[in-house]
């Protein structure tokens, strides 16, 4: 039995963990088990969720305890989920603008509220006014469609293109950096933005996220 051997083995395990799973080691420093190497976003959004902010709080505490570490921040966008998410956001923006015009409101579309009662009629008007291939009835006119089907077709019609997705990925990274500076009290000199990119969702690994790496 060798105490020195046990200490050496623990030391080796820590080194291996620091190399293979640095964020797991970082989380354990502040008594947390959460995966800190990424933070997820809702499809089409670059606004941090409550759970995302809680994760950044943990990450900020860990970085405070290790002032020599620097963080690389890389925004990602899922070609499928985020493209559809951007399409839904554009659809809702147009619906709110339509209501504002109809009611004579001189306000931005984000400030317009659409009630559940108003929504189907506004959606139908938007669907009818957009120029894209739509399902036809037996005499060649556009078919009357259920709300869910119109939403799906309009989201596909307005779906984000590659440039939109890259822009979304970069905005996510910037949102994370801003949060860490303003609310996490992390020095800007320790935070580095990397170019945004596309990442497909694989299993439980969502593509609509921001990835972190340590320097």
Where are these regions (language model features)?
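Extracellular structured ligand-interaction cores
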Residues: 209
